[in-house]
């Protein structure tokens, strides 16, 4: 009986982990971006509710923004999230998704991706594939709060 409970708990923990290594239609491009929240966007805190930042061009030489740019947001789950701006259905690099409230909307196919809890899943349209998600790492020192986005 005890072995059965250990198996069930391990299975639940394994299923609860977020898998960022899924296969996406959006081409796998390098992502390495650092956002200094303290200096550049002091309002961009998870305590302030849902907010978004769209990054379409890099400032520094060694910043990589994926396929069509980055969408970084604070979701209602109290976490920072990041995804590629490329719609997995259209794959138009020059026509990235646009933020409209709690949704990212493709201007070509009108696909709506729900950003509210960080999953970027489609809710209206033709595809069943979410936006390509990237890993976010929050780093806090005594004076600065930075968010790294990587793949």
Label the predicted regions:
Residues 13-16:
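C-terminal motif of bacterial Sec signal peptides marking the signal peptidase cleavage site
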Residues 89-90, 108-111:
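Short Cys/His-rich metal-coordination motifs, predominantly Zn2+-binding knuckles/fingers
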Residues 102:
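Winged helix-turn-helix DNA-binding recognition segment
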Residues 19-99, 117, 132-151:
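N-terminal pre-ligand scaffold of iron-sulfur
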Residues 2-8:
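Sec-dependent signal peptide recognition
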Residues 113-125, 136:
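Short metal-binding segments enriched for Cys and/or His
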